[in-house]
Amino acid sequence: MTQQFWGPCLFSLFMAVLAQETLDPQKSKVDCNKGVAGTVYEYGANTLDGGEYVQFQQYAGKHILFVNVASFCGLTATYPELNTLQEELRPFNVSVLGFPCNQFGKQEPGKNSEILLGLKYVRPGGGFVPNFQLFEKGDVNGDNEQKVFSFLKSSCPPTSELLGSPEHLFWDPMKVHDIRWNFEKFLVGPDGAPVMRWFHQTPVRVVQSDIMEYLNQTRTQ
């Protein structure tokens, strides 16, 4: 009786786990397309205080990590981790660039002038100051998306088959290559071409490990 009962149960459990792995709708990381026309050096953005327009050409020869950020997201704790990544990878010519966006759950509601104060005193709080460049708040999806994100998204496959619940997403039209949520990341190589794209929930330590593995591979080629 016991063996007759457990046999089908174990088989069902095995099939459920197998199905879950097979139908996993997301990947922690995807490689970007090879031979994409153009580079990020054709684009630029205004710094968060609006005081300077930065042409991304000035990062030529470096690796750039583009991140869309938000101050009131469950992933806002990622900010200190990005500080650590920037500090530890700076010797390897890696620069983190942050782009505040309010299109995901309306989680970046403040003005540009309020964002740094919110980070310092509210979330993450505790006097936090980002050690990487932040740019003006803007769209990363939809009709008014920043052109650099149009380029990045067209250069890399999406990390997830699912776009998310429409009631929490604020742009139109919605496209398959769109960014899914706050804190998605794109790595651009020293030639200005996109290299990798990470799912927003991929831990920063994994992102850092992936970058280091990539840097080690490029040194040996």
Swiss-Prot record:
Reported tissue expression: Expressed in the Bowman glands.
Provide the protein's localization: Secreted
List GO molecular-function terms, semicolon-separated.
glutathione peroxidase activity
Would you tell me the Gene Ontology cellular component terms?
extracellular region
The alphabetized list of GO BP terms reads: response to oxidative stress
What is the annotated signal peptide range for this record?
1-19
Q: What is its main location?
A: secreted
Instruction: Give the EC number(s) listed in the UniProt record.
Output: 1.11.1.9
Reactions this protein catalyses? 2 glutathione + H2O2 = glutathione disulfide + 2 H2O
Q: Give the annotated active site.
A: C73
Q: Which UniProt keywords apply?
A: Oxidoreductase, Peroxidase, Secreted, Signal
* Family assignment from sequence similarity: Belongs to the glutathione peroxidase family.
Name recorded for this polypeptide: Glutathione peroxidase 6
Q: Which organism is it from?
A: Rattus norvegicus
